[in-house]
Amino acid sequence: MDAHDLFRRLGVGAKFDLRRFSADAARFQIGKRKYDFDSSEVLQGLDFFGNKKPVPGDCGALRTHQELPDEEKTEESQIERKKQNRKKKKITSEITSEEEVSTIQWISSVEAKIEDKNVKRKNKLTSGKLEQLRKEKLNFFRNKHKIHVQGTDLPDPIATFQQLDQEYKINSRLLQNILDAGFQTPTPIQMQAIPVMLHGRELLASAPTGSGKTLAFSIPILMHLKQPTNKGFRALIISPTRELASQIHRELVKLSEGTGFRIHMIHKAAVAAKKFGPKSSKKFDILVTTPNRLIYLLKQDPPGIDLTSVEWLVVDESDKLFEDGKTGFRDQLASIFLACTSHKVKRAMFSATFAYDVEQWCRLNLDSVITVSVGARNSAVETVEQELLFVGSETGKLLAMRELVKKGFNPPVLVFVQSIERAKELFHELIYEGINVDVIHADRTQQQRDNTVHSFRAGKIWVLICTALLARGIDFKGVNLVINYDFPTSSVEYIHRIGRTGRAGHKGKAVTFFTEDDKPLLRSVANVIQQAGCPVPEYIKGFQKLLSKQKKKMIKKPLERESISTTPKYFLEKAKDKRKKVTGQNKKKVAPEDKS
């Protein structure tokens, strides 16, 4: 139907008002035509056989052979006119009604189409509003739990472990193990990290110490692997210390009980080479290890372990492993990453603190990485009461330590020192105070370290002296007090140290000794304490901040401190002189004999 037909149909029944628009009608010659000739003449010309005679004034009407009277003729003509008018009206009304019906139908169809479009628009708007409301709810949920996420196509967080069954079809035995272990609701890091890994996305995650990061990567790994196979290791977990690796291994074994997964840890490289070598049956699924032992196996010819089937590579305490120098494992990690050649491999980095180097590396090397952090970045746990204690000098530290012992404390207690030598010195000083104290450091054998950790967990040891490396990730349940005997070299190290207490929502306390020599490092640690809501002396806030170069220098080369000893200097110098005399006498030459 074109525009002309539409206009014609819409104009049905419209009449032109000749009286009102007479001038326009005359201009366009609209109206009745006035004839200036007699119609009888026309009729007479048409009578070829001369049968009829013209009647003047008949206006073209022909007379019949039998003429009717004027009255009857008038009545008959009126009746005929009425009939003709009725027929015309009927025909016109039928035509009009048909046209109106078709017009109405067409208009109704147009209206229906317009209504359909409006409904679709409403539906679109409704779906858009629903999506917007859903996003607002998710943002509210994340803000409530202090979850910060960066990335594209972010998976929705979970609020309960039952959602893993509803949305991801978790193994019923695995879910039961989670609930039996006492984990009723997921922690904030678990709420977001678990869905991210279940969607196969690469991850950089940071959360406070004791917030459940081990469970955050253990659950999705076990769900992803689904069931045991004989393809070799399909998941690899790297940690900086053997103690932390042992802890992760223990948690995974508990979590996977009854599922059949074979979870291994490298204790001795020689045994591992035979067990996991090329001639092995490959009846294993998950490996937990430290970098050095794994590198030793990879460098053998042929390699003592095959990582080509690894689908998930998790690096725990990633900021420590990415450090340069003797304490870091950056070179070893590069070799491990290259050994995992599967096209399915995904990587996840977990830590309590964000390191700039790790974040930049992840953004450059990981595919569509999602960054998840809980709380403020590089902040301490809010459940820990933090205190700075000025002790004046190195001698004052030991006096303050003994004062704490006299006042009484609630064990277990962790004491952090700067080096292995200082750990030994402090151990020899405290062992005579009548308290159960022990020390753990790298110079002790693995068996001694394991026994010490086991005794500390069992409550047989009240005070454990250790170096900073032990602060990484190890979960000592129920630690009530952390003492930073030597001031930490950075705010990151401080966060990891005090994170050994106040875990899983429990309250804890951290006391940090500082001397005049620690003044350059005070400002950064004081900021962390203040952010956690703990009081900081006003004069410390006025100290200058260290430049980044100075910070790195302090980390690589810590302050040289005096030896830990309460023996007065007079007796120390006297003993020193005595040793010199003894050594001097031993060096004296015997006089030659007189031969004459």
Swiss-Prot record:
One of its GO terms (molecular function) is ATP binding. A motif (DEAD box) lies at residues 316-319. Residues 194-372 form the Helicase ATP-binding domain. GO terms for biological process: maturation of SSU-rRNA. It is found in: Nucleus, Nucleolus. InterPro entries: DDX52/Rok1_DEADc, DEAD/DEAH_box_helicase_dom, DEAD_box_RNA_helicase, Helicase_ATP-bd, Helicase_C-like, P-loop_NTPase, RNA_helicase_DEAD_Q_motif. It is an enzyme of class 3 (hydrolase). Keywords: Acetylation, ATP-binding, Helicase, Hydrolase, Nucleotide-binding, Nucleus, Phosphoprotein, RNA-binding. It catalyses: ATP + H2O = ADP + phosphate + H(+). This is Probable ATP-dependent RNA helicase DDX52. It comes from Bos taurus. The lineage of its organism: Eukaryota, Metazoa, Chordata, Craniata, Vertebrata. The gene is DDX52.
